[in-house]
Amino acid sequence: MSAAQVSSSRRQSCYLCDLPRMPWAMIWDFSEPVCRGCVNYEGADRIEFVIETARQLKRAHGCFQDGRSPGPPPPVGVKTVALSAKEAAAAAAAAQQQQQQQQQQQQQLNHVDGSTKPAVLAAPSGLERYGLSAAAAAAAAAAAVEQRSRFEYPPPPVSLGSSSHAARLPNGLGGPNGFPKPAPEEGPPELNRQSPNSSSAATSVASRRGTHSGLVTGLPNPGGGGGPQLTVPPNLLPQTLLNGPASAAVLPPPHGLGGSRGPPTPAPPGAPGGPACLGGPPGVSATVSSAPSSTSSTVAEVGVGAAGKRPGSVSSTDQERELKEKQRNAEALAELSESLRNRAEEWANKPKMVRDTLLTLAGCTPYEVRFKKDHSLLGRVFAFDAVSKPGMDYELKLFIEYPTGSGNVYSSASGVAKQMYQDCMKDFGRGLSSGFKYLEYEKKHGSGDWRLLGDLLPEAVRFFKEGVPGADMLPQPYLDASCPMLPTALVSLSRAPSAPPGTGALPPAAPTGRGAASSLRKRKASPEPPDSAESALKLGEEQQRQQWMANQSEALKLTMSAGGFAAPGHSAGGPPPPPPPLGPHSNRTTPPESAPQNGPSPMAALMSVADTLGTAHSPKDGSSVHSTTASARRNSSSPVSPASVPGQRRLASRNGDLNLQVAPPPPSAHPGMDQVHPQNIPDSPMANSGPLCCTICHERLEDTHFVQCPSVPSHKFCFPCSRESIKAQGATGEVYCPSGEKCPLVGSNVPWAFMQGEIATILAGDVKVKKERDP
């Protein structure tokens, strides 16, 4: 045998495309052997349905026509039983009868079209593949209904052009290699090539997204006469025609077919476009008309009534975009929640440049920003934070709400600038390198003095290489009265179990996270408009929330004054009163960001109180906070470099390590304000009644250089005592807590011990430390 014959004998036939494939190109994981190309084209999750559809059509077609091969050869050892003469004659008679029926259907179809041509009669049309029996059509329709319930792929509005006769089924039946035989006069060669890449976009999308087996019959005659009804495959029809009866209303062209895109409006309950009507309920109408062309054409137009509203089923790209938007917003809210939860501890741990920059910027929030190319697109910056990856420098992170009042949170300037660009230009493909040169901020609300955000936050400031520019560049805080609820309040409200007595009640169900993003969104309507009753309920809750915010503004002022935000003027004789805490245990009734418009933000006031206390107690750096530093470091596994392991500190705080007993707050002149402060405040400058002292020698500790046991918060040691303990235990072996105890790590029985690098830092050259890599 020749090499070509050997190669052809090794090839297998794909069940779908019926092409000879090498064994390595075949996949045997499904009910039929299929090639990798078909699996990649249809998708592994839908290939079984396509195989089942092809199987039903092959059975109804009467085995394999047009010289199609019967598929892969039988396995070795299986004998093929030859048909008897009687069975062969019966099969031949059945095939001949079916061919006559198909010719009759083709003649009737050409008579209906009114544009019969010799070329069309000579070449078999692509529609002859649809000659199914009634039983097969019913079975295929049932399978299609089941498939729609499983996958529910809403197709985009489809226009069936003049090449509808040459459109191919997704299972690739109807001719050699699964494609129909084009006639010489059926159009340009681009339309007759019939490869998946060169087929029309409408047919390709319909065959990929709207794959349904079975036929849709009963459509009226395009000519309006009483001739036979058209038989159109369902993958070439919009999904709205498959789920409900058609009415006789003439509809405007859908979006993308010459019609202008109007503003989307919510639909009433049960109307097309509502969430319960996806897929096309009764009321969605379609018209089928004929267009004068060389071949027959069927144009289906989908709409909702005569008002020009959007159809109930939107394209899958819109749905994917909305899903990605919800996921992005949820991730941004999670980052915001994490930032707020650990802000009090982590900010105090950061270097002085980082801390000062964050304090300065936090004192300016919230302030408005807009898109440079379209001034109607407004958002607001409401929070800042500093993040760092291991081995990297700190980088500024800002949280922006866009549109204003929507609850949509973006954790980067480039993200919000990209969304603004898409809303402005309707271009979803372009990405922006840096959002700071596309955003402008208003220095003072109402002044019209808009400046580039990149001038306020240049790259040197964003990486904390330089300080914030002068005061003439800083914006003034402005809280819009029409939407006073900031996303930080939504995050804190989601964690607050109840409102303290005497301070007003929380609304019954404040939407948080994704719920807030969907119910407060103003940028564009969701592709699934909410039910009118739900929207009315959410609107009522929003009004109640805003009214509650307005009523509690005075309470916030009293809380700030009574809770220690005026602590710089507090007498040094008594312990300072605790401020409203930040974090997951906060029960405040009013979010901190809804403070008076011209006053400092509560976060900035809290940090200024900490700085003031650090100046009073520390002979060293006046701006550092020793107690906050120690409390933030007490859960760190490294007493020297605690900032490198923030994850363990957070884990310890979640495991309940922070539930310390704290003295009750001092009496307040305003009843009802005392319950605002929880009783489980972590170890902080407000909770410590005295200065930090060494556990062994009881001497005052330096605010930045001392050893903290990560297991026992009260174990704090100065460097001299730690050095003596390390020498006594032996620096070359395991060195445990300087207290003499083997303090177990959080959540385990393993005792905590110094690392070799920590020992070397504490000893500072007094004793040669054995390196971990030394033999």
UniProtKB/Swiss-Prot annotation:
Zinc finger map (RING-type): 694-741
Report the EC code(s) recorded for this entry: 2.3.2.27
Task: Write one Gene Ontology MF term.
Answer: ubiquitin protein ligase activity
Transmembrane feature ranges: none
CDD domains in alphabetical order: vRING-HC_IRF2BPL (cd16717)
Q: Where is the composition biased (Low complexity)?
A: 93-108, 195-207, 283-300, 501-519, 627-646
Compartment(s) where it occurs, according to its Swiss-Prot or TrEMBL record: Nucleus
Q: How does it assemble?
A: Interacts with CTNNB1.
Name of the protein in its database record: Probable E3 ubiquitin-protein ligase IRF2BPL
| Organism encoding this protein | Mus musculus
Starting at the broadest rank, the lineage of the source organism is: Eukaryota, Metazoa, Chordata, Craniata, Vertebrata
